[in-house]
Amino acid sequence: VIDNAEKLNCAYQPEFSMESVPPDDKETFDMLAEGHTVGVFQFESAGMTRLLVQSQAEGIEDLIAIISLYRPGPMQFIPMYLENHKEAARVKYQHPLLKPILDVTFGCIIYQEQVMQIFRDLAGYSLGRADIVRRAMSKKKHDVLEKERQIFIHGQQREDGTWEVEGCLNRGVDQATAETLFKEIQDFASYAFNKAHAAAYALVALSLIHISEPTRRRGIS
């Protein structure tokens, strides 16, 4: 089907190619913002179409976030995402180290990778250990989480006195912020999505829009 669609486009536009799908093509995102999503993978449901119109997505990072949020669990965070997306300059971060991690999602924890980055950058976890804690959060293992909450805040030393995990306090994050942040991470981690998966879905969707956009403008179906 895609091969036939590409050939049809090439008949009218010889330079057309599926090999170079622009990730920020204005015409493509204008179509999404206007709700033209019929037949587009991931985006053609009424709810998703409405969300795309509301968000006025401008780039592939917006699409990745929307795909990750439009699921039964994280749907509750969509209003906060839309509000922050609209007023990006007003988004506040509990600690400066969070900005480079959450800036792309306007202060919202959406991806599994973000959860792991927070554990690494604020508390000194290795990414491997951070992923173990993330999985414990998603499975609601309360005994593990209480232990890790203490480690996240205060750190953990090896028998020789060296730090296995430095903890937030030893990295300049105050205790109140660390405790609040752990609770927020725990709430979000239950629903956090793998960004790589969402990115793959977004690229497929963009490819379908890219291949259909010239024919739509010509009224070909």
Question: Which residues are covered by each model-predicted region?
Answer:
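Single conserved hydrophobic/aromatic residue that forms the stacking wall/gate
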Residues: 209-214, 218-221
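Mg2+-dependent phosphoryl-transfer active-site scaffold
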Residues: 1-192, 200-205, 216-217
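Pyridoxal 5′-phosphate
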Residues: 197
